[in-house]
Amino acid sequence: MKIGLLVDGRTEYHALPHVIPRLGSPHQILLPLVCDIQPFASPAQMALAASKKFPILLSKGVDSIVILIDKETRQDCTGELVQAVEREARERLAVHSTTATLAVVFKVSKFENWLVADPPGLRVLAAMFENVERIEKQVAPNRADGVDALGLLKACSRKGGYHKVKGALAICEQLDPVRAAANSRSLRKLLKVLECPGAAPPVSPQCRGRSAPIGR
């Protein structure tokens, strides 16, 4: 199966190709395309932004499309938000294809949370980071999705500070996806969607309290 990735940021666009070969998916995963999805947009607006890239991916012969979106600080239940965006996006995909499938994965809360989820990989980058144990104490076990990941990367960077794209490129060259997934539930979801070996099924979403209805 050929899978097309749609991402919502330049950092993911540049960095993910460095880790995709190590995901171990049995499928062919194409290099990502960027689409202008705003994290606080409605599900319908997110689907519209993603759908503008559907013809490009379908022309490349993809059988499935995976859309990666930052959740940021949205209070919506992640599972309900995924379902809402998938419903809207699948309606738009059906206009172009009756066979292609589609899945949505939210990065909780953003791409940097996946980058901090593999402290041993960060230790390899000794010229870039110090005090990696500070990161490890916060992300392990299974807590990477809940930390201020960008703040941690900046705080533990050596002289020169942390550059989002260059830093992500370096980290993704060292990142062990399965090791990182042990600390990130949202990354485990991506590995599951891509059918990567070692990807444990994520726990069913637990929605704490009643969130407001997710608008179209």
Q: Where are the model-predicted features located?
A:
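C-terminal accessory helical subdomains adjacent to catalytic cores in phosphodiester-
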Residues: 2-3, 13-38, 44-64, 70-216
